[in-house]
Amino acid sequence: MNNIIKMLNEEQMKTDVPQFGAGDTVVVKVRVVEGGKERLQAFEGIVIAKRNRGVHSAFTVRKISNGEGVERAFQTHSPIISSIEVKRRGRVRRAKLYYLRERSGKSARIREKLATK
């Protein structure tokens, strides 16, 4: 029984998910159905939380839109996610960046992680 569940979970997992973590700026392309048409909508922001649980993995992205903070939680292996692109790597010392909710402007900035040679 346990092997069957494990096999089904592995079957549903995507293989094209890039490596990213809290502090990284990502662009998530989401499939949106409006009327009868399907289009891709980009959601760009900072990853403030990531949960690694196999097929149940999820992450939360936060962005500032018109001066208002917007957060959206995504299931990593969901079929509505078309692609995930990492724009920039952030250097942070926490796994969850919930403290960014209370901050704005310069205090909400995240240092960039420079690539090592």
Curated annotation (Swiss-Prot):
Biological role stated in the UniProt entry: This protein is located at the 30S-50S ribosomal subunit interface and may play a role in the structure and function of the aminoacyl-tRNA binding site.
Classification via HAMAP family: Ribosomal_bL19
Name the record gives this protein: Large ribosomal subunit protein bL19
Annotated source species: Shewanella pealeana (strain ATCC 700345 / ANG-SQ1)
GO MF entries: structural constituent of ribosome
UniProt entry tagged with the keyword Ribonucleoprotein: yes
Entry similarity comment: Belongs to the bacterial ribosomal protein bL19 family.
One annotated GO biological process: translation
Gene (name only): rplS
Record's GO cellular component terms: cytosolic large ribosomal subunit
Keyword Ribonucleoprotein on entry: yes
Keyword set, alphabetical order: Ribonucleoprotein, Ribosomal protein
